[in-house]
Amino acid sequence: MRCLPVFVILLLLIASTPSVDAQLKTKDDMSLASFHDNVKRILQIRTTEECCPFIVGCCSR
């Protein structure tokens, strides 16, 4: 019975904490998906720009 009030208080504290979605975004925030898209685009440009036959995996052809 002593644990019940402590358990209820902990539940109330957990429920009152702000979620990640509640935080305001600034103009500097970038989603992780767009970051991955940028990395893919840069890697695709780099592989099509130059093809080094001596490095395995450098050339996409």
From Swiss-Prot:
Q: What is this protein called?
A: Conotoxin TxMRCL-04
Q: Which GO terms describe its cellular component?
A: extracellular region
Q: Which organism is this entry from?
A: Conus textile
Q: Which residues form the propeptide?
A: 23-46
The stretch of residues making up the signal peptide is 1-22
Q: How is it modified after translation?
A: Contains 2 disulfide bonds that can be either 'C1-C3, C2-C4' or 'C1-C4, C2-C3', since these disulfide connectivities have been observed for conotoxins with cysteine framework V (for examples, see AC P0DQQ7 and AC P81755).
Q: In which tissues is it expressed?
A: Expressed by the venom duct.
Q: Does the keyword Secreted apply?
A: yes
InterPro entries reported in the protein's UniProt record:
T-conotoxin
Highest taxon of the lineage: Eukaryota
